[in-house]
């Protein structure tokens, strides 16, 4: 009966029997080993210092059927370095991942921090200008800028098409007033001045207007509204009055009867009696 603790290794079927290799077999394995190592770029020679290497190789050949490679201790360090280099080359994803890590980090940081928004200039919408009513007046005058009771500031002038006379632009000097006016002479009749007003004044006049501009307005309403003294009468009225007085003085006046002394009572001349004459009557002073 076979003892399970002590198996019989003398049987031919045992996989653990010791094989004795001939010199021809050892040369065969040496050639295969050198060929395999030369494929990897290793020029290694079989060392006779390790007699058990052939035995180990023979056992692996019998059990697995794969040709073993014998590596001596002298080349163990160089083989380890070569294997490490080979493993690094066989795994490029690790190297690429390590090199791509900074790029991924920069991309992540870029995603976290939003790009600075460029300031958009707010375009102010131009308010539509309300068209003011216009009034035009034609006046015969030698002066272009007629007096109308307001103060104006000239801010522009330009030539008029088909007219030798330029057009002047004025603006009211009051900061709250938006009234404008244009002054130009007529190309047909140079003696006529065309004044065009745009808008209405929101303030009182500066002073009493000069010239004959009052003919277009009621003088009584103007003076009552602005509390100004009434306008003087027509100067021709004084001239007529003076002529009438002159004629009256030159005309012969009728002779009046001279009054007589009998008709007129005697007027007592006051005497210098002082205060006594005022207090004491004359009958008491002259008995």
Curated annotation (Swiss-Prot):
UniProt-listed GO biological process terms: response to osmotic stress; response to salt stress; response to water deprivation
Basic residues: compositionally biased ranges: 122-132
Alphabetical UniProt keywords: DNA-binding, Nucleus, Transcription, Transcription regulation
Name assigned to this protein: Probable WRKY transcription factor 57
DNA-binding region, residue intervals: 141-206
PANTHER family referenced in this protein's UniProt entry, alphabetically: WRKY TRANSCRIPTION FACTOR 57-RELATED, WRKY TRANSCRIPTION FACTOR PROTEIN 1-RELATED
Species annotation: Arabidopsis thaliana
Name of the gene this protein is made from: WRKY57
Predominant localisation class: nucleus
Protein location: Nucleus
Stretches of the chain forming a coiled coil according to its record: none
Signal peptide residues on this chain, from the entry's feature table: none
Stretches the record annotates as Disordered: 86-137, 248-287
GO cellular component, one term: nucleus
Biased amino acid composition, Polar residues: 262-271
Comp. bias (Low complexity): 86-99
Purpose of the protein: Transcription factor. Interacts specifically with the W box (5'-(T)TGAC[CT]-3'), a frequently occurring elicitor-responsive cis-acting element.
One term of GO molecular function: transcription cis-regulatory region binding
Family: Belongs to the WRKY group II-c family.
């Amino acid at each position: 009966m076979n003892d399970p603790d002590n198996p019989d290794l003398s049987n031919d079927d045992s996989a653990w029997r010791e094989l004795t290799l001939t010199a021809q077999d050892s040369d065969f394995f040496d050639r295969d080993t050198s060929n395999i190592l030369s494929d990897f770029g290793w020029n290694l020679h079989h060392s006779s210092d390790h007699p058990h290497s052939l035995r180990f190789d023979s056992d692996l050949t019998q059990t697995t059927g794969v040709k073993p490679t014998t590596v001596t201790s002298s080349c163990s360090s160089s083989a380890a370095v070569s294997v490490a280099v080979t493993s690094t080359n066989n795994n490029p994803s690790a190297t690429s991942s390590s090199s791509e890590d900074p790029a991924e980090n920069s991309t992540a940081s870029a995603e976290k921090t939003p790009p600075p928004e460029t300031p958009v200039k707010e375009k102010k919408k131009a308010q539509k200008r309300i068209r003011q009513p216009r009034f035009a007046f034609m006046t015969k005058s030698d002066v272009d800028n007629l007096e109308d009771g307001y103060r104006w500031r000239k801010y522009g002038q330009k030539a008029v098409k088909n007219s030798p006379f330029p057009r002047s632009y004025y603006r009211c000097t009051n900061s709250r007033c938006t009234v404008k006016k244009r002054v130009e002479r007529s190309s047909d009749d140079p003696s006529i001045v065309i004044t065009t007003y745009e808008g209405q004044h929101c303030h009182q006049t500066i002073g009493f207007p000069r010239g004959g501009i009052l003919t277009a307005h009621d003088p009584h309403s103007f003076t009552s509204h602005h509390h100004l003294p009434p306008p003087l009468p027509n100067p021709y009225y004084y001239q007529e009055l003076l002529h009438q007085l002159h004629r009256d003085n030159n005309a012969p006046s009728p002779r009046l009867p001279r009054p007589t002394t009998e008709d007129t009572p005697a007027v007592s001349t006051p005497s210098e009696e002082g205060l006594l004459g005022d207090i004491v009557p004359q009958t008491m002073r002259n008995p």
